[in-house]
């Protein structure tokens, strides 16, 4: 695939780390709109934080980078708080695993989550989500889950990628859950290493931020995947 690297518009980002396994939820703000990415836990409370952090902004969408319970668990609560007219977006492949993922979380750790409503839009590679004066470009990155995605934004304020649990500093997300694949996730790391500009700020599902440049230097999994991708 090819990405539009024409940098345009401004993007401001608020991160809220929430829940017992410290998931990062992001509020991506552009002009008078905001997109919520990975509302993990306690959706009603997240909606209150959103109103405090982003007053007066219209919520353009709720997007999940993948279908695991610790990234979709707050969707239902946020929709109740914000209104059913706020669209919920997730990849087509991961829309099919949400229910099983919630059951797995309950069995493994005893955490209970509410199943999100049916998605209003199913995302596939190459799709674009426009809001404010920027665009989020969808890159398919299977491996952590069958339908994991990265959301890339070439904004005038800087290149940003919401990478979910595909990439961690010097590592990658776990692949031992249902639908995970070590080969696929390494290939996905190589893919984003090849496609995304080196200065891209990578906003991660759990942990601190990193950049593509830093990972190309230090992440052996990305370097291995890059050889396969090219």
Model region roles, listed by residue range:
Residues 3-55, 150-164:
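Conserved beta-strand hairpin/beta-sheet module of binuclear metal-dependent hydrolase folds
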Residues 11, 57, 85-87, 134, ...:
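A structural micro-motif
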Residues 16-18, 118-120, 140-142:
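Short Gly/Pro-enriched turn/cap motifs at secondary-structure boundaries
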Residues 23, 70, 96, 169, ...:
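Active-site loop signature of alpha/beta-hydrolase-fold enzymes
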Residues 24-26, 121, 126-127, 149:
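Residue-level detector of beta-strand structural context in well-folded domains
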Residues 34, 42, 104-105, 111, ...:
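Metallo-beta-lactamase
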Residues 39, 66, 92-93, 165-166, ...:
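Short secondary-structure boundary segments
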Residues 42-130, 159, 217-227:
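Active-site HxH/HxHxD metal-binding segment of metal-dependent hydrolases
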């Amino acid at each position: 695939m090819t990405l539009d690297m024409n940098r345009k518009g401004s993007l401001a980002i608020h991160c809220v780390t929430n829940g017992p396994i410290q998931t990062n939820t992001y509020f991506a703000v552009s002009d008078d709109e905001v997109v919520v990415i990975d509302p993990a836990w306690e959706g009603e409370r997240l909606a209150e934080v959103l109103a405090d952090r982003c007053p007066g902004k219209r919520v353009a969408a709720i997007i999940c980078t993948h279908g695991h319970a610790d990234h979709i668990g707050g969707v239902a609560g946020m929709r109740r708080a914000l209104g059913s007219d706020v669209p919920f977006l997730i990849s087509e492949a991961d829309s099919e695993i949400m229910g099983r993922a919630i059951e797995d979380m309950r069995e493994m750790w005893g955490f209970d989550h509410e199943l999100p409503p049916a998605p209003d839009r199913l995302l596939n590679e190459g799709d674009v989500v426009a809001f404010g004066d920027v665009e989020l470009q969808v890159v398919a990155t299977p491996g952590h889950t069958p339908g994991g995605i990265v959301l890339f934004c070439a904004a005038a304020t800087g290149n940003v990628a919401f990478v979910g649990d595909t990439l961690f500093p010097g590592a990658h997300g776990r692949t031992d859950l249902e639908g995970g694949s070590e080969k696929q996730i390494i290939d996905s790391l190589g893919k984003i290493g090849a496609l995304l500009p080196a200065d891209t700020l990578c906003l991660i599902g759990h942990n601190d931020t990193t950049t593509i440049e830093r990972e190309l230097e230090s992440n052996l999994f990305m370097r291995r995947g890059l050889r396969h991708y090219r």
